[in-house]
Amino acid sequence: MYKQIEKWENIFSYFYIDGKIYVKTEENCILKELSLTGEVLWESKETEVRYYYVNNDVIIFNLESLEDKYTYDRTFIYDRRRKTLIFRGEIELNISYIFFNKNILNSNTNENIIVFDILKGEILKKIDKPTIGVTLLVTEKYVVKKYDPYIYIYVKSDYSLLRQQNIQDFFPGEEDLSILEIYSYKDTFIIIARVGIVCLSQKDGSLIWKSDYYACTMEIVGHYGYVCTSLSFYRVDLDTGEKYGYGRKYDRLPDFEYNGKNYWPAGHRVVYHKGLLWYRVYSSGESFILAIDPETANYQWIHKVETYEKVMDIKFYDDKMFVTDTDNNLFIYEEE
């Protein structure tokens, strides 16, 4: 299905836009625009780049403060195509990808919220109001944060606290509860809480459904959620909460064979692409990518990644598959 065409080292994070890859180098922490063959097309004059984000229109990044090495308040924005400077200023922005809605950044810290237009380099609104927890989800209407075992739902327009809920109330006595992921589905929030899943009304927080099956991650495709818990894999109907384990004991995925050797399918996440669920596995010191049929949970493709590190992420762009591992390697594959 895919063949490897490139392997790059020391890639801590990357963005893929219009056939180009944007990376931060280990040495001097310079931002670079690279072709798919690794040719340098552009690099930033600024060094010691800390956080960055790239979309179709802009490249935005920040540098360490000249006065406090734990503050990143020197912000730069470049036009991505022309490489001209749009904005340069001393403003501390949280430029994590989760806070972007097209070209509007809702920078969210524990002290304030800054709504910033990254095309114009202008502050649209500043709200000096503390918020609680780590942001897990931003929708058109809400910002959802968590501080175990609570979730905090803020109204996005003014960051007023709409509601806080103790998820432990749905799983009394469960000491392993941890809020891992939150998703927006129709007019509900789907909360992955390790010891189970809860579906709550966005409007009033009422319980729609709950499951008591362990869950670590979920990939939503249509009205189904595909859930992984190490060796187990099952499907949940997000409208009803009905679980389907493909008729397997403990919902366990079957072992697989590669070059005559048997492996456990130990992994934690699937990614949906072109009708298949792509599953990263680390077993017996080796990393694999398995393509799973979502209807049968049977394996359609087994590929060994040429690394002894754990595969961390799988993403698809155009006809390419991009894979990263824990040693900061980036593997680029092309569809066959």
Model-derived features: positions:
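Secretory-pathway ectodomains
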Residues: 1-336
